[in-house]
Amino acid sequence: MSNYLLIKQGTIHNAIEEEPFVADILVENGKIKKIAPVLEGKIINDADVIDATGIDVYPGFVDAHCHMGLDGYATGFAGEDYNELGDPVTPQLSAVDAVNPQDGTFQMACEGGVICVCTGPGSSNVIGGTFCAIKTYGKRVDDMLVKEKTAMKIAFGENPKNCYKEKGVYSRMSVAAKLREALTKAKIYDTKLHAAGCPEGWNELEMEQAQEQVMDDSQKTDADRKVDFSKMPAYDAKMEALLPVIRGEMPLKAHAHRADDIYTAIRIAKEFHVDLRIDHTTDGALIADDLAKEGFPVAVGPSFGHATKYELRHKGFHTPAALAKAGCQVSIITDSPVIEERYPALC
């Protein structure tokens, strides 16, 4: 089997050209090396060939929001690992620890042309934990990672309200208050770390060792030796997880359907000077011009199917078009398992 693959005379659709065009595609070791109307030469002669004449050829799709690998296909409770219902604020959770590459949804994704997904916690929690970006093929999630921590999931609206009434989350006011409280505590925690002279580059183990003052002197750098341990705050996994958000290194990823929830997400992001991505954006067509002015990227969908709750009543395929026309940066998402990854065209 050759290291080269030639996809010959396919009708290519991409994100650059407005119209499809016919060309050859040369692939080397799984990566596209060259595209031209006709490719010739020794390498071409040695390549494995797929005759794509009359066949549409697309780049692999990237799904910016789903729960693939955390919500098993036809597994019921045994595979439901995308919502942690013990606490409404769980930033310390990491999606990569729950992804099951052996789940059937990965094969479905490949069948649908989806080659990379951003997958992570659901929307039960005010703060749900970090998403990860992974390839949709492989046996071990560590080898499939594109990026281990892409964004911090937060949620507004009906889902956190419905899940945590017994823990005092009855209203949208409470959802917003809990988010503000966590971000404020993270800012205070960060301030204390800076006051103690703590290097920002420390990983969690180094941080925990330093706070327990058990780091061996031979392990310390010059920067480590400048740390004032008497000023170090007690190690807090939740606050550690929120530091990249507060420092502008990781965006918030906000589940928001209703227009007022979208505005609340934007309001809080601007209050704390943090980055933001908006998911679902169901009422986006109603406020498209405003969203374009704000400039935060929006992920829309899935738009296919019945409105299963009140905040979905404006869902429809008109939404991404209206947002794009207004000038927003738009992606269309499956929210898998809501829409299976093998059917991205339905989103």
What positions do the PLM features span?
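His/Asp/Glu-enriched, well-ordered alpha-helical/loop segment
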Residues: Y73-A74, E80-L85, T90-L93, P251, ...
